[in-house]
A protein has these predicted regions:
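Bacterial N-terminal signal peptides
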Residues: 7-17
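Bacterial N-terminal signal peptides that target proteins for export
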Residues: 1-7
Length: 476
């Protein structure tokens, strides 16, 4: 509350003016979210990696993937950090050449979710502006290897040294057919031909910060198949499967439910998505299928998949031109996919998302994070009306065609939350989330959000740092 003191020689009056909920910083608001048994849900932020832990100016934290890298039974995190604090990697500038900087980091997990061992496995010209990573056992030695998509140049394969994964240098190969050929934004591993060895699938958007000339040129989504030693450039074969204006996704998912992995592609320039149907067999045969959407446009950068309406078909969930929504797969192949609104976090820009049953009611909910615009290293010129760094979740209404309830968690002046991964990290029976945080130096890095359940409402968000980019209220 605000206290205003008014006094005269005869009278002293204290006037109490309540602070409106609209002016309360989001993270400080008492949570209204509850579990299925009536307990209140709030969140505690924990730091896994940041500039202090790294010992250098770690920034531009972007994609992350999870797997047991050292085979000790605990999940580890591979994260990429774009080092783009001094320039806006989302804005075209033909007169500026970004420096070839960036880091690929691993946080090795333990039995305690607050104890991690962090190392760098690639940096600089090996990993210039890394955007995404994928993990799979490519060489068949039982240890997951890493592929990284870098926006300033290429794909790089990093081979796990096995028992020495925490201490030894990781052998590497820049895939020769990708070097200097564009800007790689997404990469995935999948065994498309069921031969027991994964292929890499990547989208080349042509330029890190595409301008009009880049949008006018179609660049490929490609499959990279390896036969032989993956550290030998001659062992890799590239097959382009389609060309698009700024393709920004190439995700393997069995979208048609026939038991093999298809590939979803997304085009920023064309504002559309499509998929390549895997025709099966011992050779990779793919046929492109349109995804015609009624009610919204989708560019397909970040999407998740679930049978939202319970009809036995996977639906697509993601940011659209109308807000966060889900797109219902039709019963008949070739028919239109229909858009259904979940909600918006306007004026903030939704980018990262994950699905999980957050409130333990048996239904899938959706966690979403935004992409803050404006300065990345300073808070002073940012106000509540801009696109800020928000985290929120949407509660499933059971009837998914109805309104989803939005529960805001945090809204800081700066923060990009590009990806979330659901995990019960503290093994207490509720869902927590891993994430990266960018656009907010010196607070970038890797975090986890612990779900807290209490009998009485608490502040929605407990920050890990005393000093951070300030929490902001919602816009009226």
């Amino acid at each position: 509350m605000n206290l205003r003191h008014i006094s005269t020689a005869f009278l002293c009056v204290t006037v109490i003016t309540p602070v409106s909920r609209a002016e309360t910083p989001v993270g400080d608001m008492l949570t209204k979210a509850t579990t299925s048994d009536g307990r209140y849900i709030s969140w505690q932020e924990h730091i896994i990696d940041d500039p202090i832990i790294a010992g250098f100016a770690l920034s531009g934290s972007d994609g992350l993937v999870v797997g047991d890298i050292d085979q000790d039974g605990f999940d580890d995190i591979v994260s990429v950090h774009e080092s783009d604090t001094l320039y806006d990697s989302s804005t075209h500038d033909a007169d500026f050449t970004p420096p070839p900087e960036g880091h690929v980091r691993i946080a090795f997990g333990s039995a305690d979710p607050d104890i991690w061992t962090n190392i760098t496995i690639a940096e600089g010209t090996d990993a210039p502006a890394p955007e995404d990573a994928a993990i799979a056992d490519v060489n068949g030695d039982g240890f997951p290897d890493v592929m990284v998509a870098t926006e300033l140049s290429h794909l790089i394969y990093l081979q796990n040294p096995g028992q020495q994964s925490r201490t030894a240098e990781w052998p590497r190969l820049i895939l020769p057919m990708t070097q200097g050929k564009g800007s790689y934004i997404r990469v995935f591993f999948a065994d498309l031909d069921s031969d027991g060895r994964p292929e890499a699938i990547a989208s080349n958007k042509g330029a890190q910060r595409p301008g009009p000339k880049d949008y006018a040129v179609s660049t490929p989504v490609s499959i990279y198949r390896v036969t032989g030693d993956p550290l030998d450039g001659d062992s890799w074969q590239e097959t382009d499967i389609g060309y698009y204006s700024v393709p920004q996704n190439s995700e393997p998912i069995d979208i048609d439910g026939d038991g093999d992995l298809d590939i979803i592609v997304g085009s920023r320039g064309e504002q559309r998505i499509a998929y390549f149907e895997n025709m099966g067999g011992d050779k990779i045969r793919l046929e492109e299928r349109a995804i015609g959407i009624v009610g919204a446009r989708v560019d397909g950068f970040n999407m998740v998949y679930s049978d939202i309406n319970g009809d036995g078909l996977l639906d697509i969930i993601g940011p659209t031109s109308k807000g966060l929504g889900w797109i219902a797969q039709p019963q008949r192949k070739g028919d239109a996919w229909n858009f259904h609104l979940i909600g918006t976090i306007s004026p903030d820009l939704a980018v990262g998302l994950e699905i999980a049953d957050i409130n333990s009611d048996g239904h899938i909910d959706i966690l979403v994070g935004s992409y803050s615009l404006g300065e990345r290293g300073d808070d002073k010129n940012i106000n509540k009306h801009g696109a800020l760094g928000r985290i929120a979740w949407f509660e499933n209404p059971n009837d998914v065609t109805q309104t989803w309830t939005r529960h805001d968690i945090s809204r800081r002046k700066r923060g990009m939350f590009d990806k979330f991964i659901a995990r019960d990290l503290d093994r207490d029976g509720d869902m927590d989330f891993l994430s990266t945080r960018g656009n907010s130096a010196p607070y970038d890095g890797v975090i986890w959000l612990e779900q807290i359940r209490s009998e009485k409402p608490q502040a929605a968000f407990q920050r890990a740092r005393k000093i951070d980019s300030p929490e902001m209220p919602l816009v009226d």
